Amino acid sequence: MPWSFSASRRFVLQPNHAGWVFPHQCQQRKLWDALTGDELHSFEHKHIVRACAFSEDTNLLLTGGVEKILRIFDLNRPDAPPREVDNSPSSIRTVAWLHSDQTILSSCTDIGGVRLWDVRSGKIVQTLETKSPVTSAEVSQDGRYITTADGSTVKFWDANHFGLVKSYNMPCNVESASLEPKFGNKFIAGGEDMWVHLFDFHTGEEIGCNKGHHGPVHCVRFSPGGESYASGSEDGTVRIWQTGPANNDENDTQNSGNGPTGKVKVAADEVTRKIEGFHIGKEGKSGEKDKAADA
């Protein structure tokens, strides 16, 4: 289950789940300042919340969970009652925004498919059919593709015409998948085998594999620039992996706006002390497929 960051990376939302993440706060969504770790607001719900997403303009917050209700909070008026769309066919597993915040997509915990909702009417306008429940749904940075994970399959859909573009079978049941945002030429997937797999987008060939987690991988996401990606596991750690060769030129690193893999420019200890339950694991080291297999 992913943490959700605003587009500016300034705000972060805490995911809550009654089973394994934050059982004592399973009916809330908390909003933090990602630079300081200060809690800004808490959004109360009546039951477990499983998914959240910022709108593209970061003014709206979308949540969904066991109540089968999609809620839209206005972050400029956080204490105001949210708008509700309450006709989801089952408990909500994932949510995302599409088409410049005019469309919402969601999936359910025990029903296959991804449903697309018109924000103005609150009605379903399209369904992307899958055999298994969709555990992960991501809209690509350029808005062209919707990436979904269901069962042991990763699928890519046209985000405008909603046709299936590519479908690849994975080596295990996968919980999450993410498309590289800059070039769109590779994607990552993680699941029950505790590994983070790297694949060629055009062929589906596995080109890399990362070991290090000691529990199933529940979420994977690329950084906005694609130079690294993060994985969150049931083992309680978040690991950050480098996509390509390390850049040893410190000046280039500073100009790129990205620090070394697995390290944070701000005082991580201070931020994580304030944000209960957030842990950064030891620096992840990426390996080629053949090297990982021999390990």
Placement of each model-derived feature along the sequence:
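Conserved strand-to-loop turn within each blade of WD40 beta-propeller repeats
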Residues: P23-C26, G64-E67, S107-I111, T148-G151, ...
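Solenoidal tandem-repeat scaffolds enriched in leucines and small polar residues
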Residues: I48-K131, T135-A137
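A structural motif specific to WD40 beta-propellers
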Residues: D38-H41, A80-R83, V125-Q126, V165-K166, ...
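Hydrophobic beta-strand positions that form the internal "hydrophobic ladder"
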Residues: W20-F22, L61, I104-L105, I146, ...
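WD40-repeat beta-propellers
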Residues: R29-W32, C52, L70-D74, V114-D118, ...
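WD40/WD-repeat beta-propeller blade N-cap
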Residues: P2-S8, F43-V49, V85-I92, L128-V134, ...
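Terminal intrinsically disordered, low-complexity extensions flanking WD-repeat/beta-propeller proteins
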Residues: N173, T203-C209, H214-H218, S223-S228, ...
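Loop/turn segments within WD40 beta-propeller blades
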Residues: V12-A18, A53-T58, A96-Q102, E138-G143, ...
